C-alpha cells in the first residue's frame, strides 16, 4: 500500500486551511535582515515585510538542507513510502536541486521532485492537483505521469509596482533592458520554459497593464474552461477589483482570491503586485 507525501515550499502561496486539511509538507524560505533571520510565513508576515521596506529591504535564502533532511526523517518515521515534491522554479531558486539531493539520499522513500518552473499559485495549483489525485486513490506512478501534462495547462501573469525590487534581488530575468522607466512602460511578467521571468508584453501605465492581463485571460478562456487564482503583493484594493472582473470571464469554472503572496515573494517583487493564474481544466 502506497503512502504518498506531498512536499512544497512557502512560495506556492497555499492557504493554511488547505495545508492542514491535506497534510502538505511546506518548506520555509528564509528572510534575512541585518540583525535577524526569519522563517517565511512562520515568524514573519507579508505585511511586516512591506511595512519595513523603507527601513531595510531584506535578503532571502532557500530552505536549509537541514530542514529538508529533517523533513525526510519525519516522513520515514511516519511510514511514508513515496514523496512528490513540487518546488519553486529552478530559474529563481536552488530549492529544486537541494531537495532532489536530499531525496536521493533517502532511498527508503521513492521520490519524484518536480521543478514547477513557476512561482506562487502556479506552483500551488500543481500541488492542489497532486493532492486531489492522492485523494482519488491514484498511484504514485499515475501522479508522476500526470504532473508534466498539468503543468502545460497552467498560465501565470503578473504586474508589479516597480521593477526595482526584482533588480535588487537578482530576479529580473529577461525583463531587463526592455522597459523605459521614464515612459511609464509596464511589463506583463510571466515565466518562460526555463522558469525565468520575462516580459510577455509591455504597455504604458498601470491601468492599461491590468487591462492587458484581462485581455490575455480572455484569449485563454475563450476556448478552454479554466480555474482562476488571483493574488497580490500589498495591492489589496486593486486585486479585489481585478478579481471581480476575472470571475465574470467566460469559461471560468472556479475563481479563488488567495490574498497576499508569501513574505519572501514580496521581498523580490515589492509592493504593487497583482497576479493571475489560470489552470485549463
From Swiss-Prot:
UniProt keyword Aminoacyl-tRNA synthetase, yes or no: no
Gene3D superfamilies assigned: 3.30.1180.10, 3.40.50.10170
Positions that bind hexadecanoate: 60, 93
Family annotation (InterPro entries): DegV, DegV_C, DegV_domain_contain
One MF term in the entry's GO annotations: lipid binding
Keywords, in A-Z order: Lipid-binding
Signal peptide: none
Boundaries of every DegV domain copy: 4-280
Keyword Zinc: no
Pfam families: DegV (PF02645)
Role description: May bind long-chain fatty acids, such as palmitate, and may play a role in lipid transport or fatty acid metabolism.
Listed name of the protein: DegV domain-containing protein CA_C0948
Amino acid at each position: 500500500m502506497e503512502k504518498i507525501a506531498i512536499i512544497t515550499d512557502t512560495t506556492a502561496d497555499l492557504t493554511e486551511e488547505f495545508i492542514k486539511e491535506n497534510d502538505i509538507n511546506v518548506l520555509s524560505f528564509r528572510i534575512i535582515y541585518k540583525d535577524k533571520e526569519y522563517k517565511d510565513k512562520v515568524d514573519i508576515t507579508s505585511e511586516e515585510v512591506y511595512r519595513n521596506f523603507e527601513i531595510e529591504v531584506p535578503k532571502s535564502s532557500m530552505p536549509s538542507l537541514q530542514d529538508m533532511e529533517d523533513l525526510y526523517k519525519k516522513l520515514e518515521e511516519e511510514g511514508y513510502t513515496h514523496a512528490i515534491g513540487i518546488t519553486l522554479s529552478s530559474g529563481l531558486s536552488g530549492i529544486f536541486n537541494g531537495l532532489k539531493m536530499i531525496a536521493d539520499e533517502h532511498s527508503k522513500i521513492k521520490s519524484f521532485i518536480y521543478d514547477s518552473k513557476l512561482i506562487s499559485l502556479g506552483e500551488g495549483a500543481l500541488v492542489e492537483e497532486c493532492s486531489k489525485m492522492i485523494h482519488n486513490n491514484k498511484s504514485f506512478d499515475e501522479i508522476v505521469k500526470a504532473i508534466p501534462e498539468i503543468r502545460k495547462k497552467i498560465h501565470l501573469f503578473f504586474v508589479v509596482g516597480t521593477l526595482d525590487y526584482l533588480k535588487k534581488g537578482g530576479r529580473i530575468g529577461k525583463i531587463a533592458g526592455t522597459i523605459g522607466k521614464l515612459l511609464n512602460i509596464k511589463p506583463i511578467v510571466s515565466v518562460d520554459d526555463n522558469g525565468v521571468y520575462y516580459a510577455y508584453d509591455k504597455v504604458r501605465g498601470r491601468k492599461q497593464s491590468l487591462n492587458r492581463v484581462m485581455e490575455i485571460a480572455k484569449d485563454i478562456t475563450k476556448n478552454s474552461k479554466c480555474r482562476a487564482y488571483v493574488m497580490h503583493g500589498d495591492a489589496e484594493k486593486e486585486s479585489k477589483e481585478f478579481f471581480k472582473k476575472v470571475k465574470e470571464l467566460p469559461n471560468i469554472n472556479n475563481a479563488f482570491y488567495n490574498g497576499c503572496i508569501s513574505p519572501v515573494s514580496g521581498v523580490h517583487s515589492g509592493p504593487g503586485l497583482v497576479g493571475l493564474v489560470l489552470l485549463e481544466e
